[in-house]
């Protein structure tokens, strides 16, 4: 059973994302019709810096719903089922995940936690267990096929032995408002190492496309300037709110 590492790629995003956000925000406060200013936005007549500054000023007031008009789509592979179960908890998103029913898991890839990889005895036990699971999957699938359950019908029952470590692939689409919330929760040190690493890569890709919105995105402490998690859960990177003057 081969060990694998995560890979995150940005497949697509809404075209002209900054101008679209600017138009959406402006329409809320503009008596005219923003479609009439759209050519000026695309031509650069309304400068990017001006658009970004206007959006930032409105976001500071707490009005953020217009950022839902822009979305990003990512392809993610080499992540565990444990991660994807955490990922799909973010319900304001769209997901298309690799099926363990239609994809044969006889030689599944797996993800190994770094803490296990650093411990020689734990690593050896983990690797042996992955081999044992793979062997059990193949044996059960073969027995089911002998009973006439072939293809996906055998896979769908044999998959019950696959572990949380089994690697998966998934396509994820989120709008910017959902992404900002996702980064607040999953870039935080309280998030598990695997999903935090994936979130950090996703944030970097978003910043390349739309720095005006994502430059200061990330864990909540990055925006607030203090840790809101309380004394029990703080990582110490930022002071606690109650300790600030």
Swiss-Prot record:
Record carries keyword Transferase: yes
Domain ThyX intervals: 6-220
Pathway: Pyrimidine metabolism; dTTP biosynthesis
CC cofactor note: Binds 4 FAD per tetramer. Each FAD binding site is formed by three monomers.
Cofactor: FAD
GO BP terms: dTMP biosynthetic process; dTTP biosynthetic process; methylation
A Pfam match: Thy1
Gene3D superfamilies membership: 3.30.1360.170
One MF term in the entry's GO annotations: flavin adenine dinucleotide binding
Catalysed reactions listed for this entry: dUMP + (6R)-5,10-methylene-5,6,7,8-tetrahydrofolate + NADPH + H(+) = dTMP + (6S)-5,6,7,8-tetrahydrofolate + NADP(+)
Keyword Amino-acid biosynthesis applies: no
Active site, UniProt feature: 186 (involved in ionization of n3 of dump, leading to its activation)
PROSITE patterns: THYX
Subunit text: Homotetramer.
Family to which this protein belongs: Belongs to the thymidylate synthase ThyX family.
PANTHER family documented for this protein: FLAVIN-DEPENDENT THYMIDYLATE SYNTHASE
Function: Catalyzes the reductive methylation of 2'-deoxyuridine-5'-monophosphate (dUMP) to 2'-deoxythymidine-5'-monophosphate (dTMP) while utilizing 5,10-methylenetetrahydrofolate (mTHF) as the methyl donor, and NADPH and FADH(2) as the reductant.
Official protein name in the record: Flavin-dependent thymidylate synthase
Organism whose genome encodes this protein: Nitratidesulfovibrio vulgaris (strain ATCC 29579 / DSM 644 / CCUG 34227 / NCIMB 8303 / VKM B-1760 / Hildenborough)
């Amino acid at each position: 059973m081969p060990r694998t590492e995560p890979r995150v790629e940005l497949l697509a995003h809404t075209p002209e994302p900054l101008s679209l956000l600017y138009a959406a925000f402006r329409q809320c406060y503009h008596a005219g019709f923003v479609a009439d200013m759209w050519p000026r936005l695309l031509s650069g007549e309304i400068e990017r810096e001006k658009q970004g500054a206007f959006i930032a000023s409105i976001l500071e007031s707490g009005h953020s719903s217009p950022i839902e008009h822009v979305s990003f789509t990512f392809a993610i592979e080499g992540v565990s089922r444990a991660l994807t179960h955490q990922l799909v908890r973010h319900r304001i998103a769209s997901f298309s995940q690799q099926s363990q029913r239609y994809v044969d898991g006889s030689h599944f890839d797996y993800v190994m936690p770094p803490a296990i990889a650093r411990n020689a005895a734990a690593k050896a036990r983990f690797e042996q267990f992955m081999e044992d699971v793979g062997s059990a999957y193949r044996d059960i699938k073969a027995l089911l096929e002998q009973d006439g359950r072939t293809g996906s019908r055998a896979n769908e029952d044999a998959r019950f032995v696959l572990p949380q470590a089994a690697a998966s692939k998934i396509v994820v689409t989120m709008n910017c408002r959902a992404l900002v919330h996702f980064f607040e929760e999953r870039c935080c040190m309280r998030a598990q190492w695997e999903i935090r690493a994936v979130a950090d890569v996703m944030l970097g890709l978003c910043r390349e496309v739309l720095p005006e919105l994502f430059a200061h995105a990330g864990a909540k402490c990055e925006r607030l300037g203090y840790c809101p998690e309380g004394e029990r859960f703080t990582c110490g990177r930022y002071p606690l709110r109650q300790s600030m003057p």
